[in-house]
């Protein structure tokens, strides 16, 4: 099972979102997502969070909260994703190799082109302060020829 982290960093009523548009082959291409990535061998979820935020944004996250766990079933892949909110950081945004970083007003997040399941867990994360777990299943039909 793959383990990942996903973080939504907040500042002045806005959330830092990543528009995935730089790689030709990218399951997230054309979608807005939070920042994060795969947990490396020997790394804790929190260590992964801090490393991925730094690599993708240039920011050093100081204050954060683990909000939930999402189990993604994507075809034959199972991904265990730990969801975070970031509240305080130092540093300046850098150019991200994954896509375009942009501060989006919190009330506009659900108007973006997100994965279907993201609408569910983002609503839950922002409406309730309690830790939660959710399972999301995606099935992609591919042409066998």
Tell where the protein language model's regions lie, with residue ranges:
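Active-site-adjacent beta-strand/loop module that shapes the phosphate/pyrophosphate-binding cleft
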Residues: 11-13, 72-92, 102-106, 118-125, ...
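Conserved N-terminal beta-strand and adjoining loop/helix that marks the start
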Residues: 1-17
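Nudix hydrolase/Nudix homology domain
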Residues: 96-145
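Conserved Nudix-box catalytic region and its N-terminal flanking loop in Nudix hydrolases
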Residues: 15-51, 55
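Short secondary-structure boundary/capping segments
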Residues: 7, 23-25, 92-94
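A short coil-to-beta-strand element that immediately follows conserved catalytic motifs
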Residues: 60-68
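Short connector loops at helix/strand junctions that flank enzyme active sites
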Residues: 2, 29, 34, 61, ...
């Amino acid at each position: 099972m793959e383990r990942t982290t996903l973080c939504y960093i907040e500042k002045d009523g806005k959330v830092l979102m990543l528009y995935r548009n730089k790689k030709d082959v990218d399951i997230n291409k054309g979608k807005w997502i939070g920042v994060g990535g795969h947990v490396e061998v020997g790394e804790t979820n929190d260590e992964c969070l801090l490393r991925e935020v730094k690599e993708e944004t240039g920011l050093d996250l100081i204050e954060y909260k683990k909000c939930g766990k999402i189990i993604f079933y994507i075809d034959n892949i199972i991904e265990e994703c730990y969801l975070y909110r970031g509240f305080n950081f130092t540093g300046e945004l850098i150019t991200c190799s994954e896509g375009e970083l942009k501060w989006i007003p919190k009330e506009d997040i659900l108007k973006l082109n997100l994965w279907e399941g993201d609408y569910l867990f983002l609503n839950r994360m922002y409406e309730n302060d309690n830790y939660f777990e959710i399972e999301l299943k995606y099935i992609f039909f591919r042409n066998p020829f």
